[in-house]
């Protein structure tokens, strides 16, 4: 890789992109407005960080709800087991739990983000605390840099890794979608995912967690989802891994 990329976003995807590029011997700049990298990563899995899943490529694809084949090339090159090897090489011992879910042995998401940040520093990735505003291109459409709120950063390639719109408090504000649209990319309508469900009559059961239970979701009388796992009652309905995967 001869191009010197700038990565926009210091979450899990941005840090991984910067590490992979830097390991190929190129100078990398990473832009992140938050004071700490991996802010959303640190709260995943109830603070434990569900790193990946220990299933093979075909099984992973079979469990993607929509258009799983789109991920075939990526998973073929770097699947869940490759992810496990990557983190264990960075000094994060892992364990496999029910459902083949993979967590750090310490049960601390911070250990995962800290390992990524250490690797960034070892590879001398330039970390810049700034919020990207837009990707700069010339009259031919070639990338020339990134305009930030504080400065402008020349770049021969840009990786948009800003996250979605799921948690504004962590920096996932949808800015990456806006920048992608400015570059001519098509942004499809976004809908919620990994969310709890509202249900009547659950308030009295708030806090009760059940394991090894079945869940079936109906829409207009038609069954649209069924699975088996762990469920948590809340004051407004149900949550937990079983529900969030629905």
Residue map of PLM features:
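N-terminal Rossmann-like FAD-binding beta1-loop-alpha1 element of flavoenzymes
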Residues: 3-30
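Glycine-rich FAD pyrophosphate-binding loop
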Residues: 22-46
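Short linear loop/turn motifs
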Residues: 97-105, 192-198
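Flexible, glycine/proline-enriched loop segments at strand-loop-helix junctions
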Residues: 71-74, 102-107, 162-170
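Conserved dinucleotide-binding and phosphotransfer motif residues
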Residues: 24-26, 90, 123, 183
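Phosphate-coordination loops involved in phosphoryl transfer and adenosine-cofactor binding
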Residues: 2-4, 97, 155
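Glycine-rich active-site loop/strand segments that organize a redox cofactor
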Residues: 48-96
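Predominantly flavin-linked oxidoreductase catalytic cores and closely associated redox partners
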Residues: 110-111, 115-246
């Amino acid at each position: 890789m001869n191009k010197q990329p700038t990565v926009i976003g210091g979450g899990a995807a941005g840090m991984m992109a910067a590490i992979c590029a830097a390991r190929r011997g190129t100078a990398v700049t990473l832009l992140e407005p938050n004071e700490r990298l991996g802010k959303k990563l640190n709260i995943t899995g109830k603070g434990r960080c569900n790193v990946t899943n220990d299933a093979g490529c075909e099984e992973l694809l079979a469990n993607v709800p929509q258009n799983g084949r789109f991920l075939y090339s990526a998973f073929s090159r770097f699947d869940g087991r490759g992810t496990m090897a990557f983190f264990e090489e960075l000094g994060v011992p892992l364990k496999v739990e029910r459902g083949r879910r993979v967590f750090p042995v310490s049960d601390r998401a911070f250990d995962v983000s800290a390992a990524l940040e250490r690797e960034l520093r070892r590879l001398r990735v330039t970390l810049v605390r700034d919020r990207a505003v837009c990707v700069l291109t010339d009259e031919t459409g070639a990338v020339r840099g990134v305009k930030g709120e504080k400065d402008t950063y020349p770049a021969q390639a840009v990786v948009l890794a800003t996250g979605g719109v799921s948690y504004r408090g962590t920096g996932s504000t949808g800015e990456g979608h806006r920048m992608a649209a400015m570059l001519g990319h098509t942004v499809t309508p976004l809908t919620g995912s990994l969310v709890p469900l509202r249900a009547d009559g659950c308030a009295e059961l708030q806090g009760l967690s059940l394991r090894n239970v079945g869940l079936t979701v109906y829409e207009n009388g038609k069954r649209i989802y069924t699975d088996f796992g762990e469920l948590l009652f809340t004051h407004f309905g149900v949550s937990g891994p079983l529900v969030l995967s629905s």
